[in-house]
């Protein structure tokens, strides 16, 4: 047990899917897993363990932003010995290379947060995912006929008041979208010798101002959930 997770040791499987929204975690458990069991609920940040095609897998919410995400990731790795962490979330596209409903695999994560500089003695950390997880995601997407978009994301501490004039510069450097956690997830996994990857479904396009309806968000997220579960099975 930790200050933020009240699961018992052994409740988590070595593979864990992460979502910012705990209600989305509950949705995945009820719709996609067999024998799903709630294992933690501190602060209503829900976690479940169950089976997908006979293989054990866990789910955990992590809240919004790097600070919240890294708390849960650290505790999952250090206390519960989770070895593979796959974040599945939404993002806002900033590149013409991607559109609504596209699934992005974040091969690198820049950030305006100072957390990685603090942990890396004020140097720039190359926040990148695990190669083997990335390869599995890419190969699974090919098998499922999913056109997986591959590129960098920008993990921002800001949801509002972001510097929108920077979008063109980010796109120039092959940043496909903005989200809020990948840079912290990758850095924490690197520090603690775990494997991590972030997949994001495009729910909004910050350049064209297009956005998915609530129904379309659910449908597009389901495709990413299936990809995530298949690559971990």
UniProtKB/Swiss-Prot annotation:
EC code(s) of this entry: 2.4.2.1
Any Pfam family matching the protein: PNP_UDP_1
Catalytic activity: a purine D-ribonucleoside + phosphate = a purine nucleobase + alpha-D-ribose 1-phosphate; a purine 2'-deoxy-D-ribonucleoside + phosphate = a purine nucleobase + 2-deoxy-alpha-D-ribose 1-phosphate
Gene3D superfamilies, alphabetized: Nucleoside phosphorylase domain
Residues involved in a purine D-ribonucleoside binding: 4, 179-181, 203-204
Site label Important for catalytic activity, positions: 217
Keyword terms, alphabetized: Glycosyltransferase, Transferase
PROSITE patterns: PNP_UDP_1
Family matches, as HAMAP family: Pur_nucleosid_phosp
Described purpose of this protein according to its UniProt entry: Catalyzes the reversible phosphorolytic breakdown of the N-glycosidic bond in the beta-(deoxy)ribonucleoside molecules, with the formation of the corresponding free purine bases and pentose-1-phosphate.
UniProt-recorded name of the protein: Purine nucleoside phosphorylase DeoD-type
UniProt source species: Helicobacter pylori (strain ATCC 700392 / 26695)
Originating gene: deoD
């Amino acid at each position: 047990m930790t200050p933020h997770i009240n699961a018992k040791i052994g409740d988590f499987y070595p593979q864990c899917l992460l979502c910012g929204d705990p209600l989305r975690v509950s949705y995945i458990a009820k719709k996609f897993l067999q024998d799903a069991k709630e294992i933690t609920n501190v602060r209503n940040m829900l976690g479940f363990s169950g089976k997908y095609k006979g293989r054990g897998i866990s789910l955990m919410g992590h809240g919004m932003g790097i600070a919240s995400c890294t708390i849960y990731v650290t505790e999952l790795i250090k206390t519960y010995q989770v070895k593979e962490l796959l974040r599945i979330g939404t993002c806002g596209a900033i590149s013409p290379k991607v559109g609504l409903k596209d699934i992005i695999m974040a091969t690198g994560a820049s950030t305006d947060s100072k957390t990685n500089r603090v942990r890396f003695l004020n140097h720039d950390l190359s926040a990148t995912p695990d190669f083997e997880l990335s390869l599995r995601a890419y190969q699974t997407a090919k098998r499922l006929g999913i056109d997986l978009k591959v590129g960098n994301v920008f993990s921002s501490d800001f949801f509002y008041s972001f510097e929108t004039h920077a979008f063109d510069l980010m796109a120039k450097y092959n940043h496909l979208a903005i989200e809020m956690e990948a840079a912290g997830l990758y850095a924490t996994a690197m520090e603690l010798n775990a494997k991590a990857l972030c997949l994001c479904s495009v729910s909004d396009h910050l350049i064209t101002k297009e956005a998915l309806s609530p129904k379309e968000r659910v449908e597009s997220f389901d495709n990413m959930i299936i990809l995530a579960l298949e690559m971990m099975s």
